[in-house]
């Protein structure tokens, strides 16, 4: 992932996303609902819930909001039946895009996702059309402020991380999918806080966009997908450095 992480931009991006914080919290609450219904309300016995909680905390979701979402999911407060759906397609100039969704209306979500692909120079494909270009990996991001790089690196590698990189104020820690929870929990026990904590699709290779108008379309495709209430995460292999 070296040279393509662009995680140094995450601080600036977070500032511009403050206005969308409510939308992000709504998405996190939806993910918590699904995790609780599938495995119970105790994160110590529900790895999926524990993972979602850490992801929510990385998004600065207050503990009160997290607790309310868990209690609501444990009762009868939210009767919607959500399902995980993954869409695959291409953006402008052959950029591969994977869209992870959590929805209570499959038809609505499919229509919205297809609309954005069509509107911004892409096309929605079949399952498997681009996922072979990615590997499922664990990703942990830590703000480097006031932390010793060598100490964080050794703690990460000792915990089982595959790779560690310092990228302009952000420590980037990559793990195998099966080791993600172990590495995350070990670092949490050591007191580290994450800017991002999630399983991601890591591209095997990257694609550059040469036409400036297509750069604009690709940015709008990503932004519109990420703004959708049903979309949890957007992955792509665009090298936008």
Swiss-Prot record:
Compartment list: Cytoplasm
State a single Gene Ontology molecular function: DNA binding
Please provide the record's keywords in A-Z order: Cytoplasm, DNA-binding, Transcription, Transcription regulation
Is Signal found in the keyword set?
no
A single Gene Ontology CC annotation of this entry is: cytosol
Please give the biological process terms from Gene Ontology that the record holds.
regulation of DNA-templated transcription
| Protein's UniProt name | Probable transcriptional regulatory protein FMG_0893
């Amino acid at each position: 992932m070296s040279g393509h992480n662009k995680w140094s931009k995450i601080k600036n991006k977070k500032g511009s996303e403050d206005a969308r914080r409510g939308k992000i919290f709504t998405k996190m609450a939806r993910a918590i609902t699904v995790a609780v219904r599938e495995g119970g309300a105790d994160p110590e016995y529900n790895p999926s819930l524990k993972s979602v909680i850490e992801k929510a905390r990385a998004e600065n979701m207050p503990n009160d909001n997290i607790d309310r979402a868990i209690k609501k999911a444990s009762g009868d407060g939210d009767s919607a039946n959500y399902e995980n759906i993954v869409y695959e397609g291409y953006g402008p100039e052959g950029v591969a895009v994977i869209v992870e969704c959590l929805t209570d209306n499959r038809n609505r979500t499919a229509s919205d996702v297809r609309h954005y692909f069509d509107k911004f120079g892409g096309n929605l494909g079949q399952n498997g059309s681009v996922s072979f270009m990615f590997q499922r990996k664990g990703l942990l991001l830590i703000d480097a402020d006031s932390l010793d790089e060598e100490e964080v690196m050794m703690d990460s590698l000792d915990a089982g991380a595959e790779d560690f990189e310092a990228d302009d104020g952000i420590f980037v820690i990559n793990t195998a999918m099966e080791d993600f929870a172990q590495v995350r929990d070990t670092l949490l026990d050591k007191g580290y806080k994450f800017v991002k904590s999630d399983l991601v699709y890591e591209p095997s290779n990257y694609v550059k966009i040469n036409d400036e108008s297509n750069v604009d379309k690709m940015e709008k495709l990503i932004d519109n997908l990420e703004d959708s209430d049903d979309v949890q995460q957007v992955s792509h292999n665009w090298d936008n450095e």
